[in-house]
């Protein structure tokens, strides 16, 4: 979340502040603990808390987008129905109930340009597993099996298989 500190950061509801990947405290403040989302086109996570999307500025979470007409799917964590890389580039979409008619879903996607060209996140097996766990168990955001963030040089090329065309020629 913080481009000033390379690597993953961690925080929780049970401890004060944010810690870097070495366990060093980097902030006395912390963002919400609901969901992380790739949204605005840089390589840092954004924070999704209810229907508010925030960007960490090194000291606090600043709202960059709200999802009008959206309703979260539970009362305790206020999570989306699902967050996933569903369409287009590598950034994620969020799906919420329609606030006026919960029998309908609303899908939100970003229109912010990005200079980063990555393949769809669904090619990563760990990420696909994360999409499945959102709807079969404890609703948590998906995570990649590799690092995306400040200093990204190369990401592993996905193992992709296609059907053999000669199977269809018989």
Task: Walk through the language-model features, giving the residues of each.
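Beta-propeller-forming repeat regions
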Residues: 1-170
